Amino acid sequence: MRRHAIILAAGKGTRMKSKKYKVLHEVAGKPMVEHVLESVKGSGVDQVVTIVGHGAESVKGHLGERSLYSFQEKQLGTAHAVQMAKSHLEDKEGTTIVVCGDTPLITKETLETLIAHHEDANAQATVLSASIQQPYGYGRIVRNASGRLERIVEEKDATQAEKDINEISSGIFAFNNKTLFEKLTQVKNDNAQGEYYLPDVLSLILNDGGIVEVYRTNDVEEIMGVNDRVMLSQAEKAMQRRTNHYHMLNGVTIIDPDSTFIGPDVTIGSDTVIEPGVRINGRTEIGEDVVIGQYSEINNSTIENGACIQQSVVNDASVGANTKVGPFAQLRPGAQLGADVKVGNFVEIKKADLKDGAKVSHLSYIGDAVIGERTNIGCGTITVNYDGENKFKTIVGKDSFVGCNVNLVAPVTIGDDVLVAAGSTITDDVPNDSLAVARARQTTKEGYRK
């Protein structure tokens, strides 16, 4: 059976008090609507239509060709929004799920189960519900004497008795697609809001003797919508807790989960230890037996087995096995560290390849460079790579020793087994097995201070 999805993402989100389009506010480093799209796609849906309005181009820019789009110029209610997908879906067979773009915690597993329940019951519609202690603001599930759904009533249209009901509609539905678009044309806006409500489609189906199911989830967090910054922080916390829980169950030690942020696309090997205050974002891959020291930040990087990152920032870089970084080092985009490398305190590496066993231990900048195997770069060494217009490359061979406070003025090549004397400014290439000294000779005037 064909399966389709409609993501409702046209709301302005005025309660966010933001210039940014509501569904583009991020949870765990990713726009809310992108979380929803990934869960929808993961549930086995063949085609997705996202309903956009204010800020449409921004949403399209994030989701790209993973979705089709329909534009809702005026926000006249959820039924009106769904009807905007008519040109894409009206004649399709199969099941269509409707999901709100501001529910970033919904999982593909719950959507899969909702669809399966709906199709197994041969229902025309199924609503995902949950029971919560404080149902204010949600539509209530009103059941008849036999426990079947009678209707869904919105908060502003509910009687006091209905407001006392704690089973709520999540705003997530599964429909027989053709039934959905047939009934949408019959929805009226005679309610307190003057809007066209999608739950009214369920009442129309019931009035015609159709089957409407309720599938209740026990995970209330999943259906939480985000309407303001407080709810955004709650969703962030819930996503953080879920992600950390997953990694801990898979063999990762997280010393303080409450202060540790790990993005949803991060992979971490077993027996790795994450210390407090760490942030790991993007498509980062961390191997086994790694230690990520407190307050480190890692983005879109690869950290291989046995490496140790201490209080450092790593962006778009790779760190080899058993390599030590930090404390207080910065690996910028293009930094590639081999195995058994040491990058020490207050060292900055940018677009540089440090081969196995290389050491840059203190107070150095290495940019646009290649440092050979087992070469030692002394404290305060700088690759002078920029002339104000262009960047130039520095190459240092293997088994070389660069003394403290050396300037390597690129473009320049230092050979293998070279010794560069401390305090030198190197402007010319140095061949293998050489000593390079480029500094003024010391002059001492004895008795000068007497």
UniProtKB/Swiss-Prot annotation:
What GO biological process terms does the UniProt entry carry, in alphabetical order?
Answer: cell morphogenesis; cell wall organization; lipid A biosynthetic process; peptidoglycan biosynthetic process; regulation of cell shape; UDP-N-acetylglucosamine biosynthetic process
Q: Does the keyword Cytoplasm apply?
A: yes
Region: Linker, residue numbers: 230-250
According to its UniProt record, where is this protein located?
Cytoplasm
Q: Which Gene3D superfamilies match?
A: Hexapeptide repeat proteins (2.160.10.10), Spore Coat Polysaccharide Biosynthesis Protein SpsA, Chain A (3.90.550.10)
What is the reaction catalyzed?
alpha-D-glucosamine 1-phosphate + acetyl-CoA = N-acetyl-alpha-D-glucosamine 1-phosphate + CoA + H(+); N-acetyl-alpha-D-glucosamine 1-phosphate + UTP + H(+) = UDP-N-acetyl-alpha-D-glucosamine + diphosphate
The Enzyme Commission number assigned here is: 2.7.7.23, 2.3.1.157
The enzyme's main class, written as a single word, is transferase
Identify the metabolic or biological route this protein is part of: Nucleotide-sugar biosynthesis; UDP-N-acetyl-alpha-D-glucosamine biosynthesis; N-acetyl-alpha-D-glucosamine 1-phosphate from alpha-D-glucosamine 6-phosphate (route II): step 2/2; Nucleotide-sugar biosynthesis; UDP-N-acetyl-alpha-D-glucosamine biosynthesis; UDP-N-acetyl-alpha-D-glucosamine from N-acetyl-alpha-D-glucosamine 1-phosphate: step 1/1; Bacterial outer membrane biogenesis; LPS lipid A biosynthesis
**Binding positions for Mg(2+)?**
D102, N227
Binding of acetyl-CoA: at which residues?
A: N385, Y386, A422, R439
Q: Name one GO cellular component term.
A: membrane
Family affiliation: In the N-terminal section; belongs to the N-acetylglucosamine-1-phosphate uridyltransferase family.
SUBUNIT field: Homotrimer.
Q: What is this protein called in UniProt?
A: Bifunctional protein GlmU
- The gene from which this protein is expressed is glmU
